[in-house]
Amino acid sequence: MMVIRPVERSDVSALMQLASKTGGGLTSLPANEATLSVRIERAIKTWQGELPKSEQGYVFVLEDSETGTVAGICAIEVAVGLNDPWYNYRVGTLVHASKELNVYNALPTLFLSNDHTGSSELCTLFLDPEWRKEGNGYLLSKSRFMFMAAFRDKFNDKVVAEMRGVIDEHGYSPFWQSLGKRFFSMDFSRADFLCGTGQKAFIAELMPKHPIYTHFLSQEAQDVIGQVHPQTAPARAVLEKEGFRYRNYIDIFDGGPTLECDIDRVRAIRKSRLVEVAEGQPAQGDFPACLVANENYHHFRVVLVRTDPATERLILTAAQLDALKCHAGDRVRLVRLCAEEKTA
């Protein structure tokens, strides 16, 4: 059975294996053991209540409960940009016009922005390619909404998610090549690694401070503004179906879109509810996949089950109860996995 649980110190080698499969561009999952160990330690201290809000971040893993294999990772940053500035570009417009010459030009322009400072962030979503089946991607991504719904007071009103932009298998980013490299004088992979290992001071020191007309970029770079890596397209679709939208903010490195949503308008958060759980044999039928989570902050768990999402009393097997660390009579959080579909 696939289970979402909080990260543990012993997961570092498994996270290294996952990091080696990302193909680059996933800044928050570098293949660097020391950095990953620090990230795990920060998550543990967050759960223990030892960090200020500006440093808090939760990390979860997707585990096969039978074999102990870690198949994926996802995370939530509680409030971005309160320690180090959180940069992106806002894609706006500057108008240059002359009535005398009968000239009017509305030019797409990139403005450096810190507009999302203080927002909660969905980040570090990666599922091992071998496990991209049977709803695992949905479980991994949407499990975070169950945690946010259960512990709403720990998060801010706006949630953002940076989507990986267009990068090829060799680490080539058209957006970086045309813009970032001119100011940072390094390859995308180097900048990505420095950022992922916490060495972010160079961003504020070197990045352009003035608006940039996109027409000055290569056509290839212009074409990828706000576009996602092909492997990231499913993750974008998942978030958009939950209510997230692209509001013309992009990543400063690869030009990928930043999606955002008010936390209380996220479908899975808004529609999740608490039901009593009982042990037994679940009813057979053509039921949709649903997310089920316990309400245990320190031992949080999420699994997928097929059940009636409108039920008031959820019947689970002994194995499912054990995976959720629940007992008969406990209350669990339930929501349909996909509002638009009967099956995952």
Curated annotation (Swiss-Prot):
Q: Does the keyword Nucleus apply?
A: no
What is annotated as the active site? H229
UniProt GO molecular function? arginine N-succinyltransferase activity
Q: What is this protein called?
A: Arginine N-succinyltransferase
Q: Which UniProt keywords are present, listed alphabetically?
A: Acyltransferase, Arginine metabolism, Transferase
Q: In which pathway does it act?
A: Amino-acid degradation; L-arginine degradation via AST pathway; L-glutamate and succinate from L-arginine: step 1/5
Q: What class of enzyme is it?
A: transferase
Which purpose does this protein serve, as stated in its record? Catalyzes the transfer of succinyl-CoA to arginine to produce N(2)-succinylarginine.
Reaction catalysed by this enzyme = succinyl-CoA + L-arginine = N(2)-succinyl-L-arginine + CoA + H(+)
Organism, scientific name: Escherichia coli O127:H6 (strain E2348/69 / EPEC)
Domain of life per record: Bacteria
- Give the UniProt record's GO annotations in the biological process aspect: arginine catabolic process to glutamate; arginine catabolic process to succinate
Q: Which InterPro entries does the annotation name? A: Acyl_CoA_acyltransferase, Arg_succinylTrfase_AstA/AruG, Arginine_N-succinylTrfase
Under the heading HAMAP family, the entry gives: AstA
